[in-house]
């Protein structure tokens, strides 16, 4: 009986992990856009500090799920116009995928790309 329960728990755990990862990226993108809006409205720069465990801004934080690895710490500075101060490339690794966020200098825009970590 325990083998059946164990056998069923693995797919549920994997599904939960995928949902958690999807929600994390959705929240990260929302947090970034929200910080841009605040920078413009308050006419002061905003900072996102990204570590292996958290993404922290003034008044907000987002926990990085254990299934996601941040390659190294990043600091994104958003100016009063909502633009970036650097050409940051933030890389998030998971078991099977890598997501890269390439931020464009000055515009506040970014490009998100996904790459499989397994050979075809």
Q: Regions from the language model: what does each represent?
A:
Residues 1-3:
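N-terminal signal-anchor/signal peptide hydrophobic helix marking the start
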Residues 7, 11-22, 37, 41, ...:
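N-terminal helix-rich module
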Residues 23-36:
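Short extracytoplasmic/periplasmic juxtamembrane "stem" segments immediately C-terminal to an N-terminal membrane anchor
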């Amino acid at each position: 009986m325990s083998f059946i329960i164990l056998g069923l728990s693995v797919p549920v755990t994997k599904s939960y992990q995928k949902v958690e990862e999807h929600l994390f990226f959705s929240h990260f993108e929302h947090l970034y856009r929200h910080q841009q809006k605040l920078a413009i409205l308050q006419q002061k720069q905003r900072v996102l500090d990204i570590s292996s465990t958290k993404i922290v801004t003034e008044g907000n934080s987002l926990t990085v799920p254990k299934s996601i690895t941040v390659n190294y710490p990043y600091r994104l500075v958003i100016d009063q116009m909502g633009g970036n101060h650097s050409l940051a490339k933030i890389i998030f690794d998971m078991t099977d995928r890598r997501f890269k966020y390439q931020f464009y200098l000055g515009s506040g825009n970014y490009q998100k790309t996904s790459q499989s970590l397994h050979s075809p």
